[in-house]
């Protein structure tokens, strides 16, 4: 009986340790993904095409797709061009993270704000995304404004 208790104790201790390790790994993943989303927002705020491309190279899969109510592009270079056009229309504006990054099963969601050069917020929205096998963004689907209320 004593031996069975010892075995049970060891199994429970190993199970608790495995859960703690999994939680620590999930938290590390969340920190890494949050850092990546910050860089993605920085790319949306970077007027210099070369620096913007460097940021996108770090966070965006080569064949990644971006879709919002006004745009649908595939590939890093096309996303960079879309951002460049946005920044030409609204110089000095930036996109900032407005929520914690929610992450599960290689899916992300986060809220953002579009801040004009004068510091005023002109729009808020939410993006939903998928991560590629290498951890970079493979897909973003963006929505503008708050959710639509029920009739």
Per-region residue spans from a language model:
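Short beta-strand segments that buttress and anchor functional surface loops
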Residues: 110-117
């Amino acid at each position: 009986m004593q031996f069975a208790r010892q075995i049970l104790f060891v199994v429970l201790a190993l199970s608790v340790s495995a859960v703690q390790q999994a939680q620590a790994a999930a938290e590390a993943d969340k920190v890494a993904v949050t850092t990546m989303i910050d860089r993605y927002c920085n790319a949306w705020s970077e007027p210099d095409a070369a620096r913007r491309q460097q940021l996108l190279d770090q966070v965006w899969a080569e064949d990644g797709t971006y879709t919002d109510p006004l745009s649908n592009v595939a590939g890093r270079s096309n996303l960079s061009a879309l951002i460049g056009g946005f920044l030409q229309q609204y110089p000095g504006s930036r996109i900032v993270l407005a929520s914690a990054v929610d992450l599960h099963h290689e899916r992300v969601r986060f809220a953002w704000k579009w801040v004009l050069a004068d510091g005023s917020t002109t729009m808020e929205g939410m993006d939903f995304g998928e991560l590629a096998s290498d951890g970079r963004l493979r897909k973003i689907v963006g929505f503008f404004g708050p959710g639509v209320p029920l009739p």
